[in-house]
Amino acid sequence: MARIHPLFTFTFPCAILRSTFMRREIVLDIETRNTFQDVGAYNPSLLKISLIGVYFYETDTFETFLEEDLPKLWPRLEKSDRIIGYNLLGFDYPCMQTYYTGDLMSLPTLDVMIEIEKRIGHRVKLDDVAKATLGVGKSGHGLMAVEYWKNGEIDKLRDYCLQDVRVTRDVYEHALKNGFVRYTDRQGVAQDVPMPIELPEPDQRTAINLSLGL
């Protein structure tokens, strides 16, 4: 079942940025049950989701959704003003799309990794961005999440995923507040990346409802 995680609270002064209106932005990250090696191809659509971790600005809560809970998540994504993630377009969305009856690419999305790539010409790992920008990194490498799933350590899996969600959110908030993020280059030097991001206009429309009411 979907679970709310009240112990995860703001570690970044976001409340001021939320004051103009109740933000309906969402930050998410997915974990999978298997690896590219398991499926024999670098194809995210072949992977099976174990869990999706989500931060909801509207309620200031972190929640996790197991595979069987995903129908409860889709309407909330459709009602959001913006979905934020790191490598959403290249990994999370292709994997999620096999579970979703609508078109995830039609939803308002900000992929922080792509925004950085546009400015510096190459991709950077979230861990390198988080450590340089926030002084805090990810909780580990992706294979750990697969092992947690295989070992039935669901609570560890939830914590692992939500740490990535929290780090992604805080990198995004840093860009909102300061207009830049940092990453560590191949020489180990921290580099600034200009990233002027504005809050989305609050969307007054009814939910897109591409998931057929599920």
Task: Show where each model-derived region lies.
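DEDD superfamily 3′-5′ metal-dependent exonuclease/proofreading module
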Residues: 2-214
